[in-house]
């Protein structure tokens, strides 16, 4: 997932900060290969305690000027980047297209963007339920506060917002696509770093799972809700190609 994330966002942003949660794979090497000028920050957190992660993100953002957005590697921002020409203090809340792997036999390649290989899922436009499945992300040129508990504006911890204020920029969410061995391993690894305190507070429960449960959710919860999003995705891809620095 990391190569797709990096190759996409290096076309949009002049700089990035990647937080390394003590990875033991080739993640750091891949970042240095694809985005050699980006910063790699080793997380001060030893596990995935959700509120501590959000505090660390806020501290990093505080030292950055201009527009900033905190994303997971399963998320790709895409659309009309001219919105980011504004110098007025602004916070944009971006809704999600939730991508679902409905054709697992279709093997994907890192040589092409995911939006050219996978086309099914559901959209924030489909229903309130579908929007809430993956709430909005914030891109902002002002300081924002990520609350440690749920508020009327933001689901905390986790940095997801309950509403969106533009549909010209969106997030393509690939947490369930592609649903191959790599994707399954990534989803199963998360639970090994969720601390006891988060489990006691009921945080991150959706990460406590196994391969059978993940497969059941994909086949019975997400695939039945999915449709062909090609036309909707293409509108954002066209804007992306018009306005990004595609190499």
Per-range role (PLM):
Residues 1-14:
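Short, well-formed alpha-helical segments that are part of the catalytic scaffolds
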Residues 4, 26-71, 79:
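Active-site-proximal specificity loops/subdomain of glycosyltransferases
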Residues 8, 19-27:
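Ser/Thr-glycine-rich phosphate-binding loops at phosphate-binding pockets of nucleotides
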Residues 13, 37-40, 168:
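A generic structural signal for alpha->beta connector loops
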Residues 14-22, 42-43:
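Short beta-strand/loop segment that forms part of the nucleotide-sugar
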Residues 21, 71-73:
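Active-site acidic Asp-centered loop
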Residues 50-62, 70, 77-247:
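Catalytic-site signature of metal-activated, phosphate-bearing donor transferases
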